[in-house]
Amino acid sequence: MLDVNFFDQLQIGLATADDIRTWSHGEVKKPETINYRTLKPERDGLFCEKIFGPTRDWECYCGKYKRVRFKGIICERCGVEVTRSKVRRERMGHIELAAPVTHIWYFKGVPSRLGYLLDLAPKDLEKVIYFAAYMITAVDEDARHRDLSSLEGKVGLERERLEKRRDQSIDDRAKKLEEDLAALEAEGAKADQRRKVKDGAEREMKQLRDRAQREIDRLDEVWNTFKSLKVQDLMGDEMLYREMKNWFGKYFEGHMGATAIQKRLESFDIEAEVELLRDTIANGKGQRKVRALKRLKVVDAFRKTGNKPQGMVLDAVPVIPPDLRPMVQLDGGRFATSDLNDLYRRVINRNNRLKRLLDLGAPEIIVNNEKRMLQEAVDSLFDNGRRGRPVTGPGNRPLKSLSDMLKGKQGRFRQNLLGKRVDYSGRSVIVSGPQLKLHQCGLPKQMALELFKPFVMKRLVDLSHAQNIKSAKRMVERARPVVWDVLEEVITEHPVLLNRAPTLHRLGIQAFEPQLIEGKAIQIHPLVCSAFNADFDGDQMAVHLPLSAEAQAEARILMLSTNNILKPSDGRPVTMPTQDMIIGLFFLTTDRDGQPGDGRAFASPAEAIMAFDRGEISLQSKVRIRFTDIVPPLELGADWEQGQAVSLETTLGRALFNETLPADYPYVNYEVGKKALGAIVNDLAERYTKVEVAASLDALKDTGFHWATRSGVTVSIDDVTTPGDKADILSGYEAQAAKVQKQFERGLVTDEERRQELIEIWTQASNEVGKAMEANFDRANPIYMMVDSGASGNMNQIRQVAAMRGLVANPKGEIIPRPIKSNFREGLTVLEYFIATHGARKGLADTALRTADSGYLTRRLVDVSQDVIIREDDCGTERGLPKRIGERREDGTVVKAENAETAAYARTSAVDVAHPETGEVLVRAGEDLGDVKIGELISAGVEEVKVRSVLTCDAKTGTCAKCYGRSLATGKLVDIGEAVGIIAAQSIGEPGTQLTMRTFHTGGVASADDITQGLPRVVELFEARSPKGRSPISEAAGRVTIEESDKARKVLITPDDGSEVQEYPVSKRSRLLVGDGDHIEVGQMLTVGTPDPQDVLRILGVRRAQEHLVDEVQAVYRSQGVSIHDKHIEIIVRQMLRRITVIESGDTNLLPSDLVDRVRFEEENRRVVSEGGKPASGRPVLMGITKASLATESWLSAASFQETTRVLTDAAIHGRSDSLRGLKENVIIGKLIPAGTGLERYRNIRVEPTEEARAAAYSVTGYDSYDYEFGNGTGQAVALDDFDFGSYQN
């Protein structure tokens, strides 16, 4: 077999019949598969051992040679080579066809490649191939020209002969008529009898005349056709063709079926055709030029690659190895077989029948029919259903052809090459493991034993518990007591990977250190649930075992949960305490009035704890405590020195809470709810090492659970209190509503106005009742505590239970103007319930659809961005994008802009940023902008910073580390090899499910405001489609005039530069943003709506189009409260704008209207200019992500994405080479991917443990240092150096 690491390119091309024969190990002559009695393959059949190899290892068919010692011998009796049976997965055969057939991909695809090459319409091509018309394949021009006059004479003579014969026979008939009439007269017949005879005779003479005329016309037609006959003419009239063949057979050749195409391709002069087409393109116009351009692409491809066009017509069909189309026996003695075997059998049967007919010399019509059937059989083998009705198997199911084997989710690419099932894995239900450390997971003993079986067996032999591996295996299978001790030893320090499907982002797979547990469920640390999006209502997770030392090192250093605290989409922590933990910590840090021991003072926290234990104070009593070893809160810390004692007005609960935080963290002296906790964790992640953060998180988790239990928070129906004055509030609003209704009935307001007013009235009513309810709650009310702390639920939900349900929407998304006045505590009336469920069900249906749509969007995003990898440190560009970090208030102070978090944070500054007043440089070019730096810049009054961006990066392939900036997942500058494209796609796709589907309507009538929102809007932007409710934008600066007529409305712009007036038709219903006589600038929107990104690109240029797309996508995500960093969206937008359409090709090798990569375009131009030639001109193209993925340089990647057959057809004709730069291509052929540790520069290096690596194991005591060479995985656990973990021990 080939070693994948020893080739750099994979090329695809057209296989000729000779290629097919050289691949083959023999010809399949019979349609038989296996003998039904012996169950052994039939000789020369589809499973023949002589062709494909033995079915049993080292054993020939007849049994003469058995055993490995005969390796390589070919048995003289049965002709089978003695070898391994797995060669039946790789040896091919072939079928020699009795007549050539065309390859359906090349003639039936759109556009038809054969049609383009030969300049034939696909309809005509089909007529020829399926024996409905003859095609002239050769004309002897010289002989025809030479003999034309003599032939004309011959034809003239024949015409005269026909005319003479006609005249003769008419004369004869006329004479006979005279004789008949004379005889009748003599007999004295009546006049009408004579008339009858005369009429009959005249009829006969007319027939004679007509028949003769037809023969003469046919002769003229034959002659005229022959005179103008040229190669590739089609003749659908068989009689005409036969006559012509009879008369002038030696001057031309004509054929039917694939033979005609084959002959035509053999004589086809590619060079001459290319010249001709180039000439047409240079001088032609309109349709001719367009068609010539399209044809040139195909013809030129054959010229450049040296592919033989004859490859599109096959004389032999390859037969794929039998183990790839197996036949297996079922329980009942019946057989299940792959569809391909049926399709191959049809081809072989028809082929053999055709051979027999040809040997018998059957009539042409029968042979042609058989040839047509053979063509159809081969078509359905290659691509069933592409032409005509598909061949069906039992139960009318279309058979799966070779093309179907590659296509779609179940095809070869996506099912077996991009996603394989792996060994050393298991799955089970998950349960919570609150006693675990952040980097641990609980693994059921049985599962662990099965996963670590080989390790345990080896260790048993090493420790002399077993003599050999076999007895060790027996011990493991019988689960002897010693086995469990050995297992315990083997799994120490050996991380496992846990994965929860769907894996929407990279945090869906993380590494943990396994702890053996009883039972059958995997235990998960509560804090990592949000990363996996897991809950414990029956979710399952898969466990995978990294085997080699390298894999373990990667799992421990890169994937351990303690090293994945930050979310890659916005760089904020993802391991946040939730639910119970928040309630516990909130209960702990809250203070209440009227508690026992209020106002007491204590000399130390220990003393306060003693008082608490004796019941003298509660956790929430307001007391004063003296601390000696803390950092005071920031507001007190101005004149504080290290080690100085501080006395604080606080509570015992807060003192306990602060013990969970690092010793040098400023004392937290306020109530900690979800928001405050988020800020604290965020701060920890920014300022402390991974070890300290993990330790603090674990402490927060333990404290949270502990006090949540002690707090006794419960939910009872009595905690839900409806405000007493609800009825009074509602009666006031009822009166208002009745008034509006009355006005409507009198005709004072329209239906639409009434709706809007009612909606306003009832919204106000809901708000007021809600406020009354909130005021009614006691702070110690458990339900109020849950909402207030942010642990679970929100006020809106409580409002529905305790106040009133309010207004609801119907399935169309319109608000129903009748409110639901009851709440769930009181219960709804039947009508109210009906109204409420109506819209709610739509919501559920929406969610199901949204999941699928969102997954498909992620797939397209990954595909378009997969080859964006950090390839170098710095591309050296000085360009960048300005990003807002501050907003100036009216009083002149600058505050942080709301989007600074996702715009400038974690980027690299492109220029030096100076203080606006003092001129001192605050940030140097190339410096990282973190929270602290941004804070400094804002306090200095800087509003905007120019930052490096992937949109302005000059790297040849991928992008550079400086332009990307900080990796949001680690908080440091991104590493070379990081697959930032995939991370971007995941960050955008993962929250996709949260985006709503619907278009929101305000009123019943659809208006221009119904702009698409949510997921469909994101898809619309990334696919670069023209948006719904598109608004035109002005192409020039000038004055506006508005013209109104009955049916239409036009906006006219008179440009300032005096060029011609531009007009924009706009619909009467759209709302204008400009008025008559206004002066507008280039790119200004004319109506309410969204501009088309293509217009923005055309009018305002690339940079503005990029900004427009990024801002619009962000607008959708922000509206749903999802935070994604701009840089992720920028990566996708960059991929959408990577290509350029060539307008004038100049002296380059590019063709006009070609789509080329920006880098290639610039390189080609540089080359031409350096040689003194004329460069090409082009314009940037905005491609949707699907199109951009299919337009990738890599054919493997494109084929595994969508439209597999089309991509492969095209790639084969162009002889495409895949240089294996992206990720998918390398996964498909089984190489290491060129990203992360798979980069060239990271291979063959030694591993030295760093702080980062040790950080993972803050629970592990010291270890001996252990070096190993990279590349020869020992399978031993990766040990770490001695490391002092302070007091944080297991």
From Swiss-Prot:
Binds 1 Mg(2+) ion per subunit. It comes from Nocardioides sp. (strain ATCC BAA-499 / JS614). This is DNA-directed RNA polymerase subunit beta'. Keywords: DNA-directed RNA polymerase, Magnesium, Metal-binding, Nucleotidyltransferase, Transcription, Transferase, Zinc. Zn(2+) 1 binds at residues 60, 62, 75, 78. The RNAP catalytic core consists of 2 alpha, 1 beta, 1 beta' and 1 omega subunit. When a sigma factor is associated with the core the holoenzyme is formed, which can initiate transcription. Gene3D superfamilies: 1.10.132.30, 1.10.150.390, 1.10.1790.20, 1.10.40.90, 2.40.40.20, 2.40.50.100, RNA polymerase II, clamp domain (4.10.860.120), RNA polymerase Rpb1, domain 3 (1.10.274.100). One of its GO terms (molecular function) is zinc ion binding.
